[in-house]
């Protein structure tokens, strides 16, 4: 291109064969969605029982709390994030010393 404006002579088109990875995908494939019962069964298979040991959230208590949860891998990761974040578990004795709402 010479100059500030593009002319038709400056445009070069190159035609080549379409590569297989660029071919369009048929969105009307013959897949079937599972019914609700099958979906629920698949969710039940993914659940595992986990044993969680966490310290009491009170600063003066050294009690280790043990709870068991039935969760998916995603669910247990979310629970772990809560426990390492703002959520703290309390033992029954420390819970009795606290008032509802933390006041």
From Swiss-Prot:
SUPFAM superfamilies named among the record's database cross-references: E7 C-terminal domain-like
Region called E7 terminal domain, residue ranges: 1-45
Primary gene name: E7
Record-given protein name: Protein E7
HAMAP family recorded: PPV_E7
Disulfide bonds: none
InterPro entries: Papilloma_E7
Superkingdom, taxonomy of origin: Viruses
UniProt organism field: Human papillomavirus 47
Its job: Plays a role in viral genome replication by driving entry of quiescent cells into the cell cycle. Stimulation of progression from G1 to S phase allows the virus to efficiently use the cellular DNA replicating machinery to achieve viral genome replication. E7 protein has both transforming and trans-activating activities. Induces the disassembly of the E2F1 transcription factor from RB1, with subsequent transcriptional activation of E2F1-regulated S-phase genes. Interferes with host histone deacetylation mediated by HDAC1 and HDAC2, leading to transcription activation.
């Amino acid at each position: 291109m010479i100059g500030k404006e593009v002319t038709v002579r400056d445009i070069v088109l190159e035609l080549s064969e379409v590569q297989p990875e660029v071919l369009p995908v048929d969105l009307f494939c013959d897949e079937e969605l599972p019914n609700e019962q099958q979906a629920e069964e698949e969710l039940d298979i993914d659940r595992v029982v986990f044993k969680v040991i966490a310290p009491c959230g009170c600063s003066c208590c050294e009690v280790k709390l043990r709870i068991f949860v039935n969760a998916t891998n995603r669910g247990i990761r979310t629970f772990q994030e809560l426990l390492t974040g703002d959520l703290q578990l309390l033992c029954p004795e420390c819970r009795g010393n606290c008032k509802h709402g933390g006041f």
